[in-house]
C-alpha cells in the first residue's frame, strides 16, 4: 500500500468529495514532507500507474487539478480487504487513523476487531495484540520517567527486590535475602543462582554492581536515590555489599523501581534490543510496534502468553472500535470485552515555571489561576473518566478544595496583570487537549490571555521545552505502588516537572523538607510531614492539584490471572487465557 497516496487522498477528500479536485502543489509537499519538485514527480508517477490524472495549472494564477478514477471509499475498502487477508496490521492501522468517515469501516468492523485482542497462531502460540496511542519515549532505565515505559521495563527486566503493595513491605526477587546494619549504612544482598540474562549468561554480583554504578551517573533519573553510596563490593559471585555515606532506610525501596532494572555488564546497552532477565524479551521495536516474546529461560514461572504486541496508533476515531488494553480510550460495544476501571490513578496537576520572568512569578496571579479552575464543575459537566477532585498528591488525602472566583479580578489587579500572553503547556493526549482548552476558555472570561503550547510526551519529560518555553504546564503523574517512594520521586526526579520548573530557592527548601521526611523512622510522622510538604507547595501555588483520574482498560472476558503492575497496568507475565481465543492467525505478521 502506498501510504503517501492515501494521505493525499484523505487530505483532498476533506476539501472536496468530488473526483476532480483543485489543489496547490505546496500543500502536497507539506503533507508529504518533501519539496514541491519531488511532490510533482510523485504525482507524475501516480499518473503513470493510472492512479490519477494530473492537470497542472498553466500560467500564473491557474490552479492545478487532480482527477481520480474512483471514489476514495471504494479504494479504502479494497485495500482494507486485501490487508485483512494478508494480516497486514500496519496498513490497517494506517487507514484507521486517516481523517475519513468512520462509517466506511462498518461492514468489516468485526474482522478488524478480531485482529486485535486475543489470538492463537497456527502453531498454538497465545498472543495478546494491543494498541498504544502514542509513540514510546525512552526505555533506558537511566531516563525512563513515564508510567507506560516504566511498566514495559518491568516486563523485560527484574530488580534486586520488589515492593508488595498489599503487604506494604519489601519482598525477595533476584536477591533472595539481605541484611542491614542498625544505622542503615551497611547493606548486604545475597543473590539467587541460575538467574539467566536473555543472551544466556548467568547473572552475578558484578552485574548488580555495574547496574548501580551506571545508575549513579549525574544525569540518571536515579542519581538522587544513590548519591549516598560510598562503596560497592562484590564479596563473591552471589554476594554484594553496599556501604552508604549516611543512613538511609529508604535505600532498599529505591532498588524496587523499574529504573533499577539489572543489566548485564558484558553488553553495551541498546534500548531497541534490551537484554536483561525479565519474563519477556524484545523481539522487535520500531515506531510502528513493540513485540515482546516470552523468555523460556526465566528464573521464575515462564509467562503463559507467548507474545505481546503493542501497535502505535496516535489518531483516528475509528480506533474506538478496537480493544484497547493499554489506553484510557473506551472500547465501544463488544460483549466479549469487559471494562475495568480503577479510581484515583495518580494525579493531574499544574506546575508553575519559577525560572522565567513574568506574571506567573507573582503569587497573586498563581492564586487567581487556582480559583479559576473548579474541577468539581469539570467532573460533573465536561469530562468522562475525570475521577475525583484533588487537593493532595494522594487520593485518600484529597478533599474538595474551596474555590472563590469572586477573588480573581482583585488578585489579577494585585499582580498588575495587563492582559499579556501567558504560555500554558500541555501534552498531545486527547483528554489533556480537551481539559486545557476548557481552562483556556475559563481564563478568557476573566481577560487572562492563555496561549496553549502543545508538546509531546518526549518533549515534556526529556527536553528543556517546559522550562524555556512555558509559564506553567499541565501534566499527569501515575505513581508506582510504593506510595512514599512515588511521592519522593515526583518531587526529586530530574525529568519530572517540579525539578524542571522550580527555581533553586524553592528546590533548596524542598530538599530540606524531603530530607527530614526520609530520615523520620516513624511512618505516621512521615505521613504528617508529607501533608506539611504538600500544603507548603499548594499554599504558595507552586503546584495546583486538579483531579485524580480514572483509568479504564477493556479486557477480553477470557483473560485471567489479572494482577496489577506497580505502574497501573496489569502484569503480562501472569495473564492466561481460559478457553479458545477468538481466531487462528498466522505465526507472523506484517
Located regions from the model:
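Ligand-site clamp/hinge motif
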Residues: 297-337, 344
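Periplasmic binding protein-like
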Residues: 447-492
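Extracytoplasmic/peripheral linker and loop segments enriched in polar/acidic and small residues
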Residues: 101, 452, 490-555, 590
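Append "and occasionally in soluble cytosolic enzymes with long acidic Gly/Pro-rich linkers
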Residues: 361-441, 445
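N-terminal lobe/hinge region of extracytoplasmic solute-binding protein
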Residues: 131-180, 588
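Long beta-strand-rich cores associated with HINT superfamily self-processing modules
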Residues: 555-590
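Surface-exposed binding/hinge segments that line
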Residues: 65, 223-265, 281-284
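Aromatic- and charge-enriched surface segment that lines or borders ligand/interaction sites
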Residues: 17-21, 42, 145-147, 177-220
